[in-house]
Every structure is written in structure tokens, then in C-alpha cells.
């Protein structure tokens, strides 16, 4: 499993020792992006939705897409806009705004959403992110583990086997038998 190191990393001298690693740079805290693109193995550009949600802030998704388009190229990729604790319709509406090639981006399936939505996303996208939410907001607890098991059982039955990144649950993702590709 690839571990994406969340930024910003301070002090700056600590970041300088991490050449060749994988990084996650948020739209809400983009200061380390240039360094990470130049020195990292790959960069996951995060949409910043979780940070905005915790602060009660709104994100202008056009500005996000402008930021991504300047920097998106192989092997880097981006987490598409999502609504934390939103419903499936709100998240599907945001996916319709995507203007980037699918091989470079990943939609978020929130654990409180239906397994049918997960199946649909898996059939349509080469890469997905899982986000802990709702009754499954606490990574590692019994409900969360059961839901992750259910999700992987669904993915095993899909025609496409997308790469899956577990958002904000690196330790828990690595403790199970789940074949996550990435985590942070």
C-alpha cells in the first residue's frame, strides 16, 4: 500500500528529507505543492472538502479545477469534489462538473452512501476514494470495519477492479485484509 504523507509538513527542513515519497496536498493548504511535484514520487491533490467542512467554509469548485489543471499530469492525481455528509444526489451532481480525464481523478464514495452507488462508481471509474462518514465516521470501530468489509465484497463482484484510496484512515486501512492501493 502506498502511503501519502499529508502536507503541510513542518519544519520545512523535515519536508526536505522526504524526497521520493508520495504526498497529499490539499487545495485548502497548497503551499507545499510545487516542492512536492518537483521532489515527490507522486502527488495526490486533495479537493480540501474535509478541511472546508470542519471550518464551515465553502469552496469555489471552478477555482479548484483551475488549480488542478495547472498541475495534473502522470503520475499525479486528484480527489474530485465531494460533499461531506451530503447525499448521493449532491455528490453525483458534483461528479457531472468534472472536466478532467478520468485516469487522473477519483470520486469519493462515503461509507454512509449506498452500496449500489459504490457499485456504480466502481463500474465507471478506474480509481476511487473511500471516505469515513455518518454512522461509519470513526475509522477502526466495529461499524466501520463491517462497512469496509461490505464495500470490498461489493467491489469483488464488479466488472472493473478500481484502485481504492482510503482517506484519513491509514493505520486502520493497513490493519485489515482489504486490498487498498493507497492511504494517508
PLM regions and their residue ranges:
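Non-catalytic, usually N-terminal nucleic-acid engagement modules in DNA/RNA processing proteins
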Residues: 1-99
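Glycine-enriched alpha-helix->loop->beta-strand junction motifs that scaffold or abut catalytic
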Residues: 19-22, 39-41, 74-75, 100-104, ...
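Active-site-proximal loop/turn and secondary-structure-junction residues that shape catalytic pockets
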Residues: 29, 49-51, 84-85, 111-113, ...
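Low-complexity, flexible helical/coil segments
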Residues: 37-39, 56-59, 77-83, 115-117, ...
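Conserved, mostly hydrophobic/aromatic
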Residues: 46, 107, 178
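Catalytic cores of alpha/beta
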Residues: 59, 113-123, 169-183
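A general structural detector for well-ordered alpha-helical segments in enzyme core domains, enriched
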Residues: 60-67, 89-97, 117, 121, ...
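Glycine/Thr-rich beta-alpha phosphate-binding loop at enzyme active sites
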Residues: 104-167
